[in-house]
Amino acid sequence: MVSAAAPSLLILLLLLLGSVPATDARSVPLKATFLEDVAGSGEAEGSSASSPSLPPPWTPALSPTSMGPQPITLGGPSPPTNFLDGIVDFFRQYVMLIAVVGSLAFLLMFIVCAAVITRQKQKASAYYPSSFPKKKYVDQSDRAGGPRAFSEVPDRAPDSRPEEALDSSRQLQADILAATQNLKSPTRAALGGGDGARMVEGRGAEEEEKGSQEGDQEVQGHGVPVETPEAQEEPCSGVLEGAVVAGEGQGELEGSLLLAQEAQGPVGPPESPCACSSVHPSV
């Protein structure tokens, strides 16, 4: 029996030596065939003793993995094909880090802006103080102490300067009108040429009578007729008054001057139309 099993064992050893450089995928079917051969060797002992024959040669089946080594794929995302895909992959990988850094940067910017705005408000309040202090919001006349509505509190103190400017302008206008009224001459009724002439003639006659009476008195007292300056000044003043009253028209003025010259003729020598400025008593 031992001599009958020896050829089969040699064949198996040769097959095993030939299958050593094969891959792990071929080792599994080789082990299975080896076990089958060993199990079936006992059955074939009787037949091999009578007629020893070699079994047909075994040809292992080729698997697709025996053709050559394949590239091993590494774990992880595939490399990006363009720039945008790279940015998207970067944000996906570091989304938490980006969120934390962004929130901190936003908080820092908010604090800086709030500090700058507060500083500007303080500077503005220093240069332009509030026109309404806090004490003005309390009604001192309210003895009951009732709270006032916010709408009742005035936003700003009433400005009285426009009223003062208006009063001053009105006062100036009133002063100008009063000054112009004072400068105007009093209204007088226009006198006719006949009335003015009559008034001048009456005044001239009265002055002549006074002058003659004074001359008679002086002649009686001293025996020398002396013309006093008063007697000569009075006709001059009367003539001037008559000329002013009748001076509204040029014709009336000329008539009054002629009448005055005629009235002054017998009283004194006609040295000048008016003897008010220079009067020399004649002895």
Swiss-Prot record:
Region of interest: Disordered: 43-76, 136-168, 183-283
Position of the signal peptide: 1-25
Coiled coil location: none
Gene Ontology biological-process annotations: biomineral tissue development; BMP signaling pathway; endochondral ossification; negative regulation of bone resorption; negative regulation of myotube differentiation; osteoblast differentiation; positive regulation of bone development; positive regulation of bone mineralization
Glycosylation sites: 41
Basic and acidic residues bias (residue ranges): 153-164, 198-213
Tissue: Expressed in brain microglia (at protein level). Detected in urine (at protein level). Elevated expression levels seen in the brain of patients with Alzheimer disease. Expressed by osteoblast-like cells in bone tissues and follicular dendritic cells in lymphoid tissues.
Highest taxon above the source species: Eukaryota
Cytoplasmic side: 118-283
Keywords, in A-Z order: Biomineralization, Cell membrane, Cytoplasm, Differentiation, Endoplasmic reticulum, Glycoprotein, Membrane, Osteogenesis, Phosphoprotein, Proteoglycan, Secreted, Signal, Spermatogenesis, Transmembrane, Transmembrane helix
GO cellular component entries: endoplasmic reticulum membrane; extracellular region; plasma membrane
Cysteine pairings via disulfide bonds: none
Membrane topology: Single-pass type I membrane protein
InterPro entries hit by this protein: TMEM119
Extracellular side of membrane: 26-96
Transmembrane segments: 97-117
Record carries keyword Endoplasmic reticulum: yes
Modified residues (Phosphoserine): 272
Cross-referenced Pfam families: TMEM119
Biased composition (Low complexity): 43-52, 238-264
Protein's cellular compartments: Cell membrane; Cytoplasm; Endoplasmic reticulum membrane; Secreted
Oligomer and partners: Interacts with SMAD1, SMAD5 and RUNX2.
Function per UniProt: Plays an important role in bone formation and normal bone mineralization. Promotes the differentiation of myoblasts into osteoblasts. May induce the commitment and differentiation of myoblasts into osteoblasts through an enhancement of BMP2 production and interaction with the BMP-RUNX2 pathway. Up-regulates the expression of ATF4, a transcription factor which plays a central role in osteoblast differentiation. Essential for normal spermatogenesis and late testicular differentiation.
Name under which the protein is recorded: Transmembrane protein 119
Organism: Homo sapiens
Lineage: Eukaryota, Metazoa, Chordata, Craniata, Vertebrata
